[in-house]
UniProtKB/Swiss-Prot annotation:
It comes from Mus musculus (Mouse). Pfam families: BTB_2 (PF02214). Substrate-specific adapter of a BCR (BTB-CUL3-RBX1) E3 ubiquitin-protein ligase complex required for synaptic transmission. The BCR(KCTD13) E3 ubiquitin ligase complex mediates the ubiquitination of RHOA, leading to its degradation by the proteasome, thereby regulating the actin cytoskeleton and promoting synaptic transmission. Pathway: Protein modification; protein ubiquitination. GO terms for biological process: cell migration; negative regulation of Rho protein signal transduction; positive regulation of DNA replication; positive regulation of synaptic transmission; proteasome-mediated ubiquitin-dependent protein catabolic process; protein homooligomerization; protein ubiquitination; stress fiber assembly. The gene is Kctd13. SUPFAM superfamilies: POZ domain. CDD domains: BTB_POZ_KCTD13_BACURD1. GO terms for cellular component: Cul3-RING ubiquitin ligase complex; nuclear body. GO terms for molecular function: identical protein binding; protein domain specific binding; small GTPase binding; ubiquitin-protein transferase activity. Residues 41-109 form the BTB domain. Induction: By TNF-alpha. This is BTB/POZ domain-containing adapter for CUL3-mediated RhoA degradation protein 1. Belongs to the BACURD family.
């Protein structure tokens, strides 16, 4: 009788059983956790919803937190589907596993992703990967302070290629003494040198934000050009012809304040979306001094170039006695 009574019990128990674990998503909370099967050579990992299937040999090959988990030193619990649950982001766990298999992995290019991977490597105590990530981040930080390289323009075509290949605003200094047909005034050589020295100082100060070009083949003697988003925004010409004696002379000026002003103005074009029109107006931007009315066409205004030809009054000491000074651009 006891045998008959016990007969239908398994069937009844079977009817009360939950659905097969294979039909439920890994990590479902409807199942209680249980210890990992000790004799298994393979491990199913659920890391923050990212599923991975690997071997115990991979997980225990290096002295990491994963080795401590799967070498028997720490009890590891699985869900009903046999998945080991790890409460971490699974975004970089595949990279962690590849490093444990091969001893090296290609690292992300992004500094942000490198930092994320470094955080995961520290959590899992993967010392070799920690060192690789730290070295890569250090190299990226060093690249953030780039070398101060100043290309020298050798042709108009090369200049256009340089302008098209950079997203930075551009400052170009053209200086070419061989263009002079006349003698220089007494201060011209000194002023030409001052322009070159200022260009070098600006390049050292702003080379991370601006591209500096040097042109020694152009048609001017000394001229600054400022470019934003591939087009010329302003130009400061530092030379003029002086009729001070019986012969013409070339005068080179050093408009330091104007050069500083235009350099700061061109920084507005660092933003890839272009300068703010209100800021452009406030700084005298493309309007070239604010003389134009608000009714001017905005597109024409954007494409104007501020051309400043320096004209400084000659002091009494520089003016030859009895001679009238005439400037001609």
């Amino acid at each position: 009788m006891s045998a008959e009574a016990s007969g239908p019990a398994p069937a009844a128990a079977e009817c009360l059983e939950s659905p097969s674990p294979s039909s439920v998503e890994p990590g479902s909370p409807s199942y209680s956790l249980k210890p990992l099967t000790p004799n298994s050579k393979y491990v199913k990992l659920n890391v923050g919803g990212s599923l991975h299937y690997t071997t115990l040999r991979t997980l225990t090959g290096q002295d990491t937190m994963l080795k401590a988990m799967f070498s028997g030193r720490v009890e590891v619990l699985t869900d009903a589907g046999g998945w080991v649950l790890i409460d971490r982001s699974g975004r970089h766990f595949g990279t962690i596993l590849n490093y444990l298999r091969d001893g090296s992995v290609p690292l992300p290019e992004s500094a942000r992703e490198l930092g994320e991977l470094l955080g995961e490597a520290r959590y899992y105590l993967v010392q070799g990967l920690i060192e690789d990530c730290q070295l890569a981040l250090q190299q990226k930080r060093e690249k953030l302070s780039p070398l101060c390289l100043i290309p020298t323009v050798t042709s108009p075509r090369e200049e256009q290629q340089l302008l098209a290949s950079t997203s930075k605003p551009v400052v170009k200094l053209l200086h070419n003494r061989s263009n002079n047909k006349y003698s220089y005034t007494s201060t011209s050589d000194d002023n030409l040198l001052k322009n070159i020295e200022l260009f070098d100082k600006l390049a050292l100060r702003f080379h991370g934000r601006l591209l500096f070009l040097k042109d020694v083949l152009g048609d001017e003697i000394c001229c600054w050009s400022f470019y934003g988003q591939g087009r010329k925004i302003a130009e400061v010409c530092c030379t003029s012809i002086v009729y001070a004696t019986e012969k013409k002379q070339t005068k080179v000026e050093f408009p330091e304040a104007r050069i500083f002003e235009e350099t700061l103005n061109i920084l507005i074009y660092e933003n890839s979306r272009g300068p703010d029109l209100a800021l452009l107006e406030a700084t005298g931007g493309a309007a070239g001094g604010g003389g134009a009315g608000r009714g001017d066409d905005e597109e024409n205004r954007e494409h104007r170039v501020r051309r400043i030809h320096v004209r400084r009054h000659i002091t009494h000491d520089e003016r030859p006695h009895g001679q009238q000074i005439v400037f001609k651009d």
